[in-house]
């Protein structure tokens, strides 16, 4: 700023203050043990950490509008489902905007359910119980063989399906009474209320439809589902090393084998399995596809109910319009008859001298009576003809 003709340099501390207020991406990191920690890092650190491209990370930008997407990459799953924006790897989950009120329950659910596959790390610490745990491990090891990324994906799908189902239930609770009230009493307030509910239903239907379409697209393509098997791809990359060390673990030290987590055993098993086998993921996606499809069916039923209500209201309005037209016909017919009466009165009321106007005062009542009778007869004829043609009284 110029003062007395001199340039005054800007305050450098003010510039530093502005730089400190630059917003950074907010993330939450949840590992396989269920521990979570906040991460305030930029997009380049995220890209380097999970090895994804910038275009994939751009999908998770809350300032940009992207449809619901589930992308499988080499070492990560990019998940964009409404407010749930996450990056899932074979060992951890990066969740966007963890302080959002809709995301906080997802974080808590991830912390609760992700450590299930690693529960065997905490067992077998007694002196004589370790070998027994190793022997019984074969019986309990098959209870939860889902890889880490599938458990995280299941939490996200369950959260978004439950969220959309809850929004649908709220909409149904408000919509059905409003529609019933509108059918009984058509008013501007009720019409505006139903209009807002219909707009909300249209937006919610579009959101549910996007999630359903994404799940359907995944189920239709086995290659896309195979890309989501991160543990299998990671195990396949390290299979030569694993195949050498694996026999010694089980033959020499059963106690070490008892400490191997279920997720690790599942990863080792997939090394020798069919890489095109996507049955486990297909069953997982089908369950939530049916759930989201049920939500969409509820919205479709609500839309049909709204359409039926609109048709009923239109029928009522058409009926009222027909009644108004009938009333207009009656009034028009009466006006024609009165105009005939006025015509006679106007003829006799003209100020024109004629001889037979004198000495015939007794004719006034006959003229009035005959003219009125003629008008009534004409009105009855018009209304009878209209009723015969079905224009009135139907």
Curated annotation (Swiss-Prot):
The question of whether rRNA-binding is a record keyword is answered with no
UniProt short sequence motif Required for magnesium transport activity, positions renumbered to this chain? 349-351
Query: What CDD domains does UniProt report for this protein, alphabetically?
Result: Mrs2_Mfm1p-like (cd12823)
The UniProt entry lists membrane topology as: Multi-pass membrane protein
Q: Which residues form a coiled coil?
A: none
One function term, GO molecular function aspect: magnesium ion transmembrane transporter activity
Q: Which UniProt keywords apply?
A: Ion transport, Magnesium, Membrane, Transmembrane, Transmembrane helix, Transport
Which residue ranges does the record annotate as region Disordered?
115-145
One of its Pfam families is CorA
The disulfides recorded in the entry are none
Miscellaneous remark of the record: Has the ability to complement mutants in Salmonella enterica and yeast lacking magnesium transport capability.
**Which protein is depicted?**
Magnesium transporter MRS2-2
Q: Which organism is it from?
A: Arabidopsis thaliana
Biological classification of the source: Eukaryota, Viridiplantae, Streptophyta, Embryophyta, Tracheophyta
Q: Which gene encodes it?
A: MRS2-2
């Amino acid at each position: 700023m110029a003062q007395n003709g001199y340039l005054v340099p800007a305050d450098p501390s003010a510039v530093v203050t502005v730089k400190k207020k630059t917003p950074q991406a907010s993330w939450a990191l949840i590992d396989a043990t269920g521990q979570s920690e906040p991460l305030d890092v930029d997009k380049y650190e995220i890209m380097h950490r999970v090895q994804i491209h910038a275009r994939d990370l751009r999908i998770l930008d809350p300032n940009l509008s992207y449809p619901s997407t589930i992308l499988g990459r080499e070492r990560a799953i990019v998940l964009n489902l409404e407010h749930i924006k996450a990056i899932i790897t074979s060992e951890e989950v990066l969740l966007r905007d963890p302080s959002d009120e809709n995301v906080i329950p997802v974080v808590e659910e991830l912390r609760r359910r992700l450590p299930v596959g690693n529960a065997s790390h905490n067992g077998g610490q007694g002196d004589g119980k370790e070998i027994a745990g190793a022997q019984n491990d074969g019986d309990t090891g098959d209870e939860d063989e889902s890889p880490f990324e599938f458990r995280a994906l299941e939490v996200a799908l369950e959260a978004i399906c439950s969220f959309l189902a809850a929004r649908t239930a709220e909409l149904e609770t408000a919509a059905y009474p409003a529609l019933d009230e509108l059918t009984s009493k058509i008013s501007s307030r009720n019409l505006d209320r139903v209009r807002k509910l219909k707009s909300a239903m249209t937006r919610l239907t579009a959101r549910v439809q996007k999630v359903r379409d994404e799940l359907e697209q995944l189920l239709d393509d086995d290659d896309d589902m195979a890309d989501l098997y991160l543990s299998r791809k990671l195990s396949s990359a390290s299979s030569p090393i694993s195949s050498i060390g694996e026999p010694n673990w089980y033959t020499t030290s059963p106690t070490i084998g008892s400490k191997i987590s279920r997720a690790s055993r599942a990863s080792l098993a997939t090394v020798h399995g069919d890489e095109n086998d996507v049955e486990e993921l297909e069953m997982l996606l089908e369950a939530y596809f049916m759930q989201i499809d049920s939500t969409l069916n509820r919205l479709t039923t609500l839309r049909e109910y709204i359409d039926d209500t609109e048709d009923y209201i239109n029928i009522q309005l058409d009926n009222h319009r027909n009644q108004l037209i009938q009333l207009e016909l009656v009034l028009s017919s009466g006006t024609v008859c009165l105009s005939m009466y006025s015509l006679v009165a106007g003829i006799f009321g003209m100020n024109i001298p004629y001889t037979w106007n004198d000495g015939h005062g007794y004719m006034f009542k006959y003229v009035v009576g005959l003219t009125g009778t003629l008008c009534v007869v004409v009105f009855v004829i018009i209304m009878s003809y209209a009723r015969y043609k079905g224009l009135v009284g139907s």
